[in-house]
């Protein structure tokens, strides 16, 4: 079984197969989605107190906040070596 994992910053990792969208948090509709997820208890804040730069929407309706730029997360998602890096770090631990 080969599960691709994506580093979303500060050692936080998300399964690539669960990601539906990676968007910027600037627009009003995304801010509403974040607030609704917070009220439902479906918000995961992975920013470590830093500014939110990317909002990741998952297929389970969880909303994940990341301090990494959306372009960076997308690049890691599309990178073939990203999974190898995560596997290597998992073997070391």
Curated annotation (Swiss-Prot):
Cystine pairings recorded for this chain: none
InterPro entries registered for this protein in UniProt: RemA-like
One Pfam family per UniProt: RemA-like
Family of this protein: Belongs to the RemA family.
Protein name: Putative regulatory protein Amet_2791
Taxonomic placement: Bacteria, Bacillati, Bacillota, Clostridia, Peptostreptococcales
């Amino acid at each position: 079984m080969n599960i691709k994992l994506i580093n979303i910053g500060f050692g936080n990792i998300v399964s690539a197969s669960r990601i539906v969208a990676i968007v910027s948090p600037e627009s009003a509709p995304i801010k509403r989605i974040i607030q609704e997820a917070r009220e439902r208890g479906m918000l995961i804040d992975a920013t470590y107190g830093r500014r939110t730069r990317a909002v990741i929407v998952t297929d389970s309706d969880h909303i994940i906040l990341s301090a990494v730029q959306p372009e960076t997360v997308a690049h890691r998602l599309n990178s073939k070596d990203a999974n190898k890096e995560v596997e290597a770090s998992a073997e070391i631990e």
